[in-house]
Amino acid sequence: MDIQAHINEVWPKLHAIAEPAFKEVKTAAFLADFLRKLGYDVTENVGGTTALTAVLDSGKPGPTVAVRTDMDCLLFKNEDGSLEPIHACGHDAHMTIALGVAKLLQEQGLACGRVKILCQPAEEIGRGALAMLEAGALDDVQYALGYHVMPKDMARSGQIIAQINWTACTLMEGEIRGLAAHGSQPHLGVNAIDAGAAIVNAINALHSNPLLGGSIKTTRFMGGAGSLNAICDKVSIGFDLRSTSNTEMLELRRKVEDIVVNTAKVYGAEADCHIVGTCPAAEADPSLLALTQEVISAELGAGGLIPAANITVGEDFNFFKQERPQLKTASLGIGCNLEPRLHDRDMHFDHSALANAINVLTNLTQRILCVKP
């Protein structure tokens, strides 16, 4: 297989048909057609979504290794107000890698077990992995390999991170309900802004274990949009929570909800708080991590291996491990001189570096299939 020719042919086609979450219709059709022509057993519309799976079966007993790619893009607003779909997070690169791995594995053949390509929608809104889990796409999988192109300051071309330690993140929003009154008679009302300000101060006074990287930020505070001489009766408030520990994240959520509800009561207001979205932190398997590091070093040399890296971003791939604890997962970071940053409409990268990812993931898959139970 000419890997560079594969990249040059496939990436532009996927880049040109960028589609947002759960609308990856053309993208999914392209992937399904490509994989079916390789002889994979393709299942489309998994869980009633654009998700698809493709299986290559050796016909011999052994583990099932999943190679996961995301499919969706981001939407950017143009000057005329229109929304433009752009692959600014590298999912076009991820799909190009997955198809390259699928093709190499088909050419090499499998000694035992099965390979399952997971083409996942809606990563950008954190719902695609859960949709595939709910549809049973991971029920027959023992190993799952994820990966992401990384900014240049984390990994350069010729380097691969063996494990990205993604952070757990939770978005929460609440509503504070007071009682409206005229500004000349504040004692007859309940000022939701007063309660909200106290909530923000209480949130800022929380101190989490610095070794776990926990943080809570107030990211929304909206209220009092009416007259300036009216006591505000409603405030909308929002929070961004982060932690490297899934256990600590549960505690942070509890604390935020307690503060919002109980602080509002002190001011005579009512409040509620709920989760809008969440992603768990990465949980690496030690034995798989060691094997991944070994494979990267063998392919790229010692200078090409970055053993692990922490990042404060969330990734819904981590739901696979959280919902299937017996699953062994790895999340690799692909160095490709990516600039200026992810989620920038002008993001660009070294396409030739995708060949490293294709080779490493193919070799890692083959090594896993050779692991003796």
Where are the language model's segments positioned?
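Acidic/His- and Gly-rich active-site-bordering loop/insert found
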Residues: 1-88, 92-111
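Structural motif
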Residues: 63-66, 115-116, 142-145, 197, ...
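Histidine/acidic-residue-rich, glycine-tolerant segments that coordinate divalent metal ions
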Residues: 52-55, 74-88, 92-93, 105-221, ...
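Non-cysteine beta-strand/loop elements that form the S-adenosyl-L-methionine
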Residues: 66-68, 77, 172, 329-336
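General structural feature for long, well-ordered alpha-helical segments within catalytic domains
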Residues: 3-10, 23-34, 63, 97, ...
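Metal-dependent amide/peptide-bond hydrolase catalytic core
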Residues: 197-373
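Active-site beta-loop-alpha junctions enriched in small/polar residues
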Residues: 19, 70-72, 122, 150, ...
